[in-house]
Amino acid sequence: MLTLIPVSLAQANEFVRQHHRHHKPVAGHKFSIGCAENGRLCAVAIVGRPVSRYLDDGFTLEVNRLCSDGTKNACSILYAAAARAARAMGYRKIITYTLDTESGASLRAAGWTNAGLAGGKAWTCLLY
């Protein structure tokens, strides 16, 4: 059974260091959330200020890293939890980016919508 658990930035960054395909750990965050399967950490979400200064309006957060060991449904659980937490904290919008080569199924399952291509055209911006 999958459950949400609190994780520190250090724990989340270590998981990213071990499991993320193309990104390194982050310098800071607003909060991080873990997903555990039978007590074993299987995925993390690191949520912080938007990387784009144009989107950093004080009411928007970004899922800066989401990383899983491949456990089924862990990513969608974390995307949904991150959106709920951001709303509960008073944020009006939460965004993330995904590579065009990724399906986005976990984001759609969590209720996120595609906002279109990002400036670099290899990434797609999604919002909740």
Language-model features, listed with the residues they occupy:
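Short, conserved, surface-exposed binding loops centered on an aromatic residue
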Residues: 25-26, 35, 85-88
